[in-house]
């Protein structure tokens, strides 16, 4: 088992598996676009790097 596992990982690396596509890490361009939209939001505080209350879906993360 100690030899079989490394051989299988070399032949079939986990990175070769298809991603599900619904995670933010799977969509870096959209993630960057979301950050840009947040920074342009009127409730966004650039010093604290969060949104003042009342926060809504257009501005994340909220300052607590």
Swiss-Prot record:
Example of a GO cellular component annotation carried by this entry: extracellular region
Record key words, sorted: Cleavage on pair of basic residues, Disulfide bond, Hydroxylation, Secreted, Signal, Toxin
Tissue specificity statement from the Swiss-Prot or TrEMBL entry: Expressed by the venom duct.
Keyword check for Signal: yes
Main location: secreted
Organism domain of life: Eukaryota
Molecular-function annotations in GO: ion channel inhibitor activity; toxin activity
Disulphide bond pairs: 50-63, 51-59, 55-62
Entry text on domains: The cysteine framework is III (CC-C-C-CC).
Family affiliation: Belongs to the conotoxin M superfamily.
Name assigned to this protein: Conotoxin Pu3.4
Taxonomic lineage of the native organism: Eukaryota, Metazoa, Spiralia, Lophotrochozoa, Mollusca
């Amino acid at each position: 088992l100690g030899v079989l596992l490394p051989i299988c990982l070399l032949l079939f690396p986990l990175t070769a598996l298809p991603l599900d596509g619904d995670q933010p890490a799977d969509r870096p361009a959209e993630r960057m676009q979301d950050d840009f939209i947040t920074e342009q939001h009127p409730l966004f505080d650039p010093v604290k790097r969060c949104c003042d209350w009342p926060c809504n879906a257009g501005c994340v993360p909220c300052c607590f």
